[in-house]
Swiss-Prot record:
<dbReference type="GO" id="GO:0003735">
    <property type="term" value="F:structural constituent of ribosome"/>
</dbReference>
<dbReference type="InterPro" id="IPR021137">
    <property type="entry name" value="Ribosomal_bL35-like"/>
</dbReference>
<dbReference type="InterPro" id="IPR018265">
    <property type="entry name" value="Ribosomal_bL35_CS"/>
</dbReference>
<feature type="region of interest" description="Disordered">
    <location>
        <begin position="1"/>
        <end position="45"/>
    </location>
</feature>
<comment type="similarity">
    <text>Belongs to the bacterial ribosomal protein bL35 family.</text>
</comment>
<keyword id="KW-0689">Ribosomal protein</keyword>
<feature type="compositionally biased region" description="Basic residues">
    <location>
        <begin position="23"/>
        <end position="42"/>
    </location>
</feature>
<dbReference type="InterPro" id="IPR037229">
    <property type="entry name" value="Ribosomal_bL35_sf"/>
</dbReference>
<dbReference type="GO" id="GO:0022625">
    <property type="term" value="C:cytosolic large ribosomal subunit"/>
</dbReference>
<feature type="compositionally biased region" description="Basic residues">
    <location>
        <begin position="1"/>
        <end position="15"/>
    </location>
</feature>
<protein>
    <recommendedName>
        <fullName>Large ribosomal subunit protein bL35</fullName>
    </recommendedName>
</protein>
<keyword id="KW-0687">Ribonucleoprotein</keyword>
<dbReference type="GO" id="GO:0006412">
    <property type="term" value="P:translation"/>
</dbReference>
<dbReference type="Pfam" id="PF01632">
    <property type="entry name" value="Ribosomal_L35p"/>
</dbReference>
<dbReference type="InterPro" id="IPR001706">
    <property type="entry name" value="Ribosomal_bL35"/>
</dbReference>
């Protein structure tokens, strides 16, 4: 059987932590930030853990 390839789109969007959690960037912080409140842009900063229902699917794409 051939080697499984990592899904290149998923590898750019998700990372696995040392403890095995899958993390992602938060949405709505790319552009058009001028009219969004500073409070909202701060809240959308940084990474967050992927929802429990999606973890299995994402790990499969990452061959994890």
């Amino acid at each position: 059987m051939p080697k499984a390839k990592t899904h290149s789109g998923a590898s750019k969007r998700f990372r696995t932590t040392g403890s095995g959690k899958v993390v992602r960037q938060k949405a709505n912080r790319r552009h058009l930030l001028e009219h969004k409140p500073t409070k909202r842009t701060r809240r959308l900063d940084g990474r967050t853990v992927v929802a429990a229902n999606d973890v299995k699917r994402v790990k499969k794409l990452l061959n994890g």
